[in-house]
Amino acid sequence: MTDLDYLNHAERALAAIELACDRINDASDADIDNQRTVGMITLTFANRSQIIINLQKPLQEIWMAARAGGFHYKCNSNQWLNTKDGSDFFVALSQHASEQSGQAVVFNS
């Protein structure tokens, strides 16, 4: 994958996270605050816990830090997969965000 392809896929993923936060906040009382800076999104929950998602351009990966730990994802055919177990980024984000917010939330690509 070229650097440009990586950036396009990664930026689409970050935009999808922002849109999902808006949708979740409109449809529930989850109250997920999302702040985006260049190449990074910080999700802050009502209990002040956070999930941080950032781009790792040299490795062409997306990293996620949650209470459960740190996870690395690489793009494979428009899907971000965990570099260790092959799990989907958005499924994992939904799981970690649900745990940290105390209610079921779903993030989609």
Where in this protein do the model-derived segments appear?
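N-terminal intrinsically disordered, cationic/polar leader segments
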Residues: 1-109
